[in-house]
Amino acid sequence: MPLRGAIVVMRGAILAMALAFSVAGTSYAQRIAPFDRLAGNWSGSGTIELSNGSHETIRCRAAYDVLREHSKLQLSIRCAGEGANFDLRANADYSAGAISGYWSESSRGASGTISGRADGDRFQVVARAASFVATLTLVTHGGRQSVTIRSQDPQSTIKAVSVNLRRTS
């Protein structure tokens, strides 16, 4: 019986340590400001879905600069394909889970506001302009990131953009 009791105590100690490390890891992950996960340069490829139903392969580069106590972000996402290009820039602020800021897209001369939420590794943002609304979902897992942009404007020549990126620095 003494051996059996020692095994039970050892299992309990291992379980307690595992629980302590998982809680510590979770609280550490929650302390990381959402923009910190994005910082750096990224590149990859994806597709643009055009309003006529066709798809075009694109290559993309993204740069994220985190500023002022990890609550401000400047981003640039440039993508190019054979016929469709875009150059998206934004400045965003983060506070208590909420994201707000401004965006511009130079090849179409469009600009407007962004608003949304950050939850862990996921950003869900709505970009608005005078006659344009799009949703942007950005998910980061370590050195990988997916970006999906969907136009809510039926007149837009681009319906959706889907890009997978890898951190380069």
Positions of PLM-derived features:
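N-terminal secretory signal peptides that target proteins for export/translocation
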Residues: 1-9
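Central antiparallel beta-sheet cores of small beta-barrel/beta-sandwich binding domains
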Residues: 31-139, 150-169
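Bacterial N-terminal signal peptides
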Residues: 11-22
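Sec/Tat signal peptide C-region and signal peptidase I cleavage site
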Residues: 24-29
